[in-house]
């Protein structure tokens, strides 16, 4: 049901961004079917909605439509048109306001297959046993998203592909493997790996080098 709305969202996003609308790829539709994974995007006057909306090239505006596309699973099919009409005015307002908090809070996103490696200031003195050395050998995205850290708070998650020994920056990828339940500090506290960067504390689940997530 959600994937049927993706073309509509894409068209509206293209109009807002001044670009053209491209149909979602099969892997994008696969991601759309898993509401428990991917990014949590803050939508005004609505709860946090997990939805990556991976259009080719990673449209920022299409991400902004997450709340409109992520139709609650419990809505019966006959009521879907009424839900769309109910959400449409709010959607138009969100997209029309240049200062919309929805648009300001979202940055571009790339499909996992287009991940790029950007490593800065590597420290050659790091011991090879340092887990960060192992993690740094993987390619990572370099964008900022909003992740639901607890039920009532939203924190920034910033992704990096570089590190230092004394002030380590950690990683958050791949996008499709992120599980919002696993991103909760409360549930992963015993597995956290702590580090310091620029005077701030960063915490990372110790699960694997390809899915480390940092909290700020």
Curated annotation (Swiss-Prot):
Organism: Homo sapiens
UniProt key word S-adenosyl-L-methionine: no
Tissue-specificity statement: Ubiquitously expressed with higher expression in heart.
Position of the signal peptide: 1-23
Domain of life of the source: Eukaryota
Coiled-coil boundaries: none
Protein name as annotated: Putative cat eye syndrome critical region protein 9
UniProt keyword Glycoprotein present: yes
Compartments reported by the entry: Secreted
Main location: secreted
Other remarks in the entry: Candidate gene for the Cat Eye Syndrome (CES), a developmental disorder associated with the duplication of a 2 Mb region of 22q11.2. Duplication usually takes in the form of a surpernumerary bisatellited isodicentric chromosome, resulting in four copies of the region (represents an inv dup(22)(q11)). CES is characterized clinically by the combination of coloboma of the iris and anal atresia with fistula, downslanting palpebral fissures, preauricular tags and/or pits, frequent occurrence of heart and renal malformations, and normal or near-normal mental development.
Sugar-bearing residue positions: 148
Gene: CECR9
Annotated GO CC locations: extracellular region
């Amino acid at each position: 049901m959600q994937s049927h709305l993706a073309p509509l969202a894409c068209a509206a996003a293209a109009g807002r961004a001044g670009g053209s609308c491209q149909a979602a790829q099969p892997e994008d539709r696969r991601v759309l079917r898993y509401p428990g994974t991917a990014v949590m995007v803050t939508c005004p006057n609505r709860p946090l909605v997990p939805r990556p909306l991976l259009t080719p090239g990673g449209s920022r505006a299409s991400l902004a439509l997450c709340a409109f596309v992520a139709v609650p699973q419990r809505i019966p099919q006959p009521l879907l048109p009424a839900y769309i009409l109910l959400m449409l005015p709010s959607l138009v307002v969100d997209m029309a306001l240049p200062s919309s908090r929805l648009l300001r809070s979202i940055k571009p996103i790339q499909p996992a297959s287009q991940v790029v490696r950007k490593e800065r200031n590597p420290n050659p003195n790091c011991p090879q046993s340092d887990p960060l050395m192992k993690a740094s050998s993987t390619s990572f995205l370099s964008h900022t998203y909003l992740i639901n850290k607890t039920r009532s708070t939203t924190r920034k998650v910033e992704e990096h592909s570089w590190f230092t020994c004394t002030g380590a920056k950690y990683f958050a990828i791949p996008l499709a493997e992120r599980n919002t339940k696993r991103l909760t500090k409360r549930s992963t506290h015993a597995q956290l790996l702590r580090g310091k960067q620029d005077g701030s504390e960063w915490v990372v689940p110790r699960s694997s080098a390809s899915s480390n997530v940092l909290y700020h």
